[in-house]
Amino acid sequence: MYQTDQLLQVSANLFKHLGDIPNGEERDEYIETINTMLDKRETIIKGLKQEGFQFDEQNRIHRTLLELDKGIKQRLAAVMDAVKQDMANLQKTKKSEQQYFNPYSNVRVMDGMYYDKKN
């Protein structure tokens, strides 16, 4: 029973931590914290599986864990979407910057070319 309480505490902390997504330089530390919390949670879950943990719908703690797990999955998806959006914006910025420095790199015009035909 001790591990289920520990899992509940770690899951609640993770759910709370996933509540707001920081911007900029703070995001790297934020993601590292998420990874460490997920690793802790994973080790606790593996320990529970080795003990032969059985889910009981009548148990209040088990239902709370299930609800927290659903919320964690939703918030993790939101974090992933935010990171994907930032990566897409970064790629767009890089492309715009490259286009600014060399505006004629993608132009494929054959103007000014001629073929010298010698018999």
Curated annotation (Swiss-Prot):
Q: Which UniProt keywords apply?
A: Bacterial flagellum biogenesis, Chaperone, Coiled coil, Cytoplasm
Give Gene Ontology CC terms. Answer: cytosol
Assembly with partners or alone:
Homodimer.
Name under which the protein is recorded: Flagellar protein FliT
Q: Which GO terms describe its biological process?
A: bacterial-type flagellum organization
Annotated membrane-spanning segments are none
The encoding gene is fliT
Q: Locate the coiled-coil region(s) and give their ranges.
A: 72-99
Q: Provide the primary localization.
A: cytoplasm
* Localization of this protein: Cytoplasm, Cytosol
Q: Which family does it belong to?
A: Belongs to the bacillales FliT family.
Function (record text): May act as an export chaperone for the filament capping protein FliD.
Query: Its domain of life?
Result: Bacteria
